[in-house]
Amino acid sequence: LKILMVSSEAVPYAKTGGLADMVSSLSINLAKLGHEVKIVIPRYYSVDRSGLKLLPDAMGTPMGGGIEEWSAVYTADMPGATKKNPVKVYFIDHEIFFGRDGIYGNALETDFIDNPRRFTFFCKAVFQLCRKINWFPDVLHAHDWPAAVAPVYLKFAERTAGSAGEFKDTVSVMTIHNLGYQGVYHKDNYDYAGLGWDVFYKAGFEDWSMMNMLKAGLYSCDKLNTVSPNYAEETKIQVHGFRLDGVLRYRSADYSGILNGIDYNVWNPEKDKYIPQLYSSKNMEGKAKAKEALQKEFGLPANSKIPIIGMVTRLTDQKGVGELFGPAYGSAWSICRDMDLQLVLLGTGDTWCEIEIMGLTSRLSNFKAKIGYSEKLSHLIEAGSDFFLMPSRYEPCGLNQMYSLVYGTLPIVRSTGGLVDTVENFNEKTGSGTGFMFDYLSPSSIYDTVGWAVWAWYNRREYIEKMRKRAMAVNFSWELSAKKYIKLYEETLKKQGIKLKVNVQ
């Protein structure tokens, strides 16, 4: 199959979150399965042009109001892909739209005021790029709201009777990475799309007199999915649907969840370059060394008998930090005061939470935190901790709980989203499970579940060791996820009555 990934981010070029990792990893693994994959992203100011190849001639993209936007196009080979199965990355270089600090906003402007124009142009330019390189995909795979207008252009412009017909056999798949971000702007921005106001309503842009880019993509794509099966079900109910639950119920027959994978070349205790000693489920000596190094790094007393609970997180409401660190009601103080454990945290985010956390570290001898992010330290926390705490309010997929399982670190999580699909709750009677789960997000439920894990550490140690080995045996490879995406692509082509050109390997 010919597959075109349309995204605002892809590592190592542009990243604000897990979207960037997913797009690159999925593309590389689809290519390994024998498919022809290309990625298109904007060339932001932060992307160094010196490592890119400039394609000849500027590219014109006609927009609404008689405007024609001109851009340069650069290309590069995706690092990590093989020479036998390369992945080409194309960069749309529009100096006014993308030649600035930040992807969606900067320190002065949380959300750039021209974001609807920036990413509407990007979505239209994708089709001009295909014409420029004379390559037309079987599948256009759009990711999150910045790419959501691409399926709209495909359905209402490029596949219509009046079009040139190059995309008549192209289908679209739309992936939701986080339903909380939808690209909602004033509808005055819509004229720039050049699609006509009848399409505004037909495509589903209309959202209480605003323009909702993600909603339009979800209405217009041929099939849609999200990044875990359980999150797909959750988003169809009002409490988790961010006002789009009705759309997702309407598209229910075409909506599914596919769990993200993880990169075992990076997150693997048998290969990890950031930990003091490699280890595996057959020889756990390296985990003990990592625990010792972690205690030293955070200035905690070296003690192999006391459990360490680790956290690597964004300090935002989505991650449950209010219930854990809220100054009047958070449970972190009580947990550290009442339980014989050590708690370490690496994170950055809301200012109030950073201040509260640093205050707690000065008052509690068994709680230590570092504000910021460090790749090396995040690996050490995953390897050296005994438990990993994720009290998320909602979690589309979640990666840290999967990293934890691979490292034999048992997750303590709320049963939401992808956490339900990846963690099996502990059974006191049989010792089965790979982690500890709670249903309702509250300070008391976090306290009780951490207490449950600490109780098991001191009173059911043989179960803890069995859970570790069971956790380390779980397979979260991207190859498995890639095969599920191929099945989704084939189902989409079949739905549209387009004959398959390549079989799944």
What are these regions (language model features)?
Residues 1-505:
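Catalytic cores of nucleotide-sugar-dependent glycosyltransferases that transfer UDP/GDP/TDP-activated
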